[in-house]
Amino acid sequence: MRQSELIRAAYEGKNTLVIKNANVVNVFTDEIVRADVAVYEDVIIGVGSYSGENEIDAGGAYLAPGFIDAHVHIESSMVIPSSFMKVIMPHGTTTVIADPHEIANVAGAAGIRAMYKLTDELPLRVLFMLPSCVPATPFEHSGAKLVAEDMEQFMHKSRVLGLGEVMDANSVINCSQEMLDKLRLFDKRPIDGHAPMLEGMGLNAYRVAGAFSDHECSTYEEVKQKLATGMNILLRIGSAANNMDGVLRRIAKEKLPTRNMMFCTDDKHIEDIRREGHINANARMAVAAGIDPIDAIKMASYNAARAYGIRGVGAIAPGYKADMVLLEDLKDFKVKQVISRFGRPYTGEEQMPSPILPPQVFNSVRLPEISKYDLALRCHVSAPVIKMIPHQLVTELVYRDVERDENGCFIPSEGMVKLAVIERHHATGSMAVGILEGLGIKHGAVASTVAHDSHNLVVAGDNDEDMLMAIESLRDCGGGYSVVSRGVVLARLPLPIAGLMTAAPVNDVLEIQQALLDALYSLGAKRDSDPLIALSFMALPVIPAVKLTDEGLFDAVNFKFIKYN
């Protein structure tokens, strides 16, 4: 569209859509004004009194900028981007800032290209931060490795904003040349941080390196400390990490400024989105905690656009893009209608092109033969154990007196199961076995190729036979999730795209997901949290306190391996 055409349309009031009788949220003046909003093609040309051939009567509903998820891994939804869009857009999200490091860890640059192509023509605006840590650390094996040179091919792309979450803070602080090369490449662009519990001089060094945001704060004190360094704080409500209520209440109570705060989901399963909402759920929680509704709207939209330099997005004003959301109120944030980035009402019936994917993202489960001898874990009577913490990604390192057989090998008992991580990209045979507390299952096993961030195969169970069957079940289907009990596969979700995603219809995926959860609950898993997503983070060595990689039990606080014997 020519600039002169837009200027004339704005001057003459010529429009392609008018939203009438709306309570318009102005993020610049912190006001709510009863007005009409005129749109020409995909741009807002005015807020005032308008009429046109194509009108939507808001009937006094609140009109807000389309919501922005400031940090998300689309692959964690387990469905392709067009299916993901159909789940989140009805909840008012019109823009996501995606970090495709899940598929990049499996398929490298080919995976990034695939995600870029799959999102090119969607009504959902999908912007990208390029994965900075593939693999996340040098303490595990992933399917690919990305260095600064690999990223240069993407720098010119219009939807690439900056560098994705820098999880390996240790490499930053120690001035790893490989990490410095990436930071220099993105010196003039946003660089996302990922630094749980980092403080003091370490945090100072991390900020000096260029990290400008963090989505890993779990306490009010951490939020305030990082905010004071100039960081943007992304308040996350995901499926596994869902502990923001108390933090938001303190923010409201202490009247901490929210202008550098925004919302994200990071990793949220589609059934949770359908049940709870997406970014509108973050806004709902914020208002319930005492945050001013207009501030909550800004945290859900404008703040992220401003921080990431997304021009013309995040506000309802002349010259801004026309993606907007009509809300019944500013308490529950129930969505009445969504206007997409194309300046048209989103119906969910839009025809999407068939996904075309490169061969590199298929047949990604490559395993050697695994036997029960590979699953044996020799240990002392007092053994290190990974203790899961409900609703959090962090774990606790504890020592427990465990049962052992005549060979000194761990026998699952007393709420503790065996956990194994197996390299699944190149059939190297690299694998490690550990002990996990808190999963709660008995007489069975669960396996997954969704295992952040290297996405090796992770399997947990209280007996070797079911663990082996779960492993073979995923080898056969090209990756996904599998639950086994007493030699029977109770449920399996094939994820043939990089072992992470499927092109199957969302309802089919939800049905199988529920079958997986029901199977795990029947085996004793706790119903107050999602055991599938919790398990998928047990191999992520950049989140404290202890995790298991294919190389061994890793102390994520002191960055060293812990031996069992």
Regions found by a protein language model. Name each.
Residues 16-18, 54, 94-96, 124-127, ...:
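Structural motif
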Residues 22, 42, 60, 71, ...:
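Divalent metal-coordination and catalytic microenvironments
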